[in-house]
């Protein structure tokens, strides 16, 4: 995994955790949790690709990995839409920058997961 991606995830999560969005802070905490979950999932897929022999063990261990993959793409799409929505409604420049970086990172991670999944199929 690219060290820039790791630092990007950590930076965005740290920035998001500092935001106070009033009544929507529960939603923000949910976004942070999903970001963390997405990072772990992407990392595990990347590791499976690195050990291509693990493809069969991945499939045997989890016969529903394609279903999980589909679910992760749905989560990514939801996060992208949520981040875009937040970006449109916020007027705070710190939050705008954070959400723009989060959006860029989500698009990069979506592409990485697609690449990993095609290698595993």
Curated annotation (Swiss-Prot):
It is found in: Virion; Host nucleus. HAMAP family: INFV_NEP. Pfam families: Flu_NS2. One of its GO terms (cellular component) is host cell nucleus. Its main location: virion. The lineage of its organism: Viruses, Riboviria, Orthornavirae, Negarnaviricota, Polyploviricotina. This is Nuclear export protein. Belongs to the influenza viruses NEP family. It comes from Influenza A virus (strain A/Turkey/Ontario/7732/1966 H5N9). One of its GO terms (biological process) is exit of virus from host cell nucleus through nuclear pore. Keywords: Host nucleus, Host-virus interaction, Transport, Virion. Mediates the nuclear export of encapsidated genomic RNAs (ribonucleoproteins, RNPs). Acts as an adapter between viral RNPs complexes and the nuclear export machinery of the cell. Possesses no intrinsic RNA-binding activity, but includes a C-terminal M1-binding domain. This domain is believed to allow recognition of RNPs bound to the protein M1. Interacts with protein M1. May interact with host nucleoporin RAB/HRB and exportin XPO1/CRM1. A motif (Nuclear export signal) lies at residues 12-21, 85-94. The gene is NS. InterPro entries: Flu_NS2.
């Amino acid at each position: 995994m690219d060290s820039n991606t790791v630092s990007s995830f950590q930076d965005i999560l740290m920035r998001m955790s500092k935001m106070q969005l009033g009544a929507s802070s529960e939603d923000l905490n949910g976004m942070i949790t999903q970001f963390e979950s997405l990072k772990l999932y992407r990392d595990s897929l990347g590791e499976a690709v690195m050990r291509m022999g693990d493809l069969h063990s991945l499939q045997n261990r989890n016969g529903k990995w394609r279903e999980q993959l589909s679910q992760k793409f749905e989560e990514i799409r939801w996060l992208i839409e949520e981040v875009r929505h937040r970006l449109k409604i916020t007027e705070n420049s710190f939050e705008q920058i954070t959400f723009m970086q989060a959006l860029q990172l989500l698009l990069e991670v979506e592409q990485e997961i697609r690449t990993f999944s095609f290698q595993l199929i």
